[in-house]
Amino acid sequence: MGAKFDIFKKLPDGHPLWVKAVDGLEEAKVQLARIAASSPGEYFIYSVRNACIVHARMVPQG
């Protein structure tokens, strides 16, 4: 089991919406890409261990 990461979607008002928890950064990136493909927007991956954002992705809508 790898390190824990949380995937969040940034809402239009700037607040984060928790999407899911994932084991391992590479798996978190794969899951983020899948989620963003079906629901475009701004997402980020948060490292639970390091208490910081480690990856962000913007998927334009439209």
State the predicted function of each range.
Residues 1, 29-37:
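Short linear motifs in intrinsically disordered
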Residues 14-26:
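A short, exposed loop/beta-hairpin motif centered on an aromatic-Gly-Thr core
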Residues 1-17:
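Short aromatic-glycine-(Arg/Gly/Cys) micro-motifs in beta-strand/loop hairpins
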Residues 26-31, 62:
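Short, surface-exposed linear segments at secondary-structure transitions and domain or protein termini
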Residues 37-62:
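Short, mixed-charge low-complexity intrinsically disordered segments
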Residues 10-12, 25, 48:
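Generic structural motif
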Residues 15-18, 31, 49, 55:
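Generic short amphipathic/hydrophobic targeting helices enriched at N-termini
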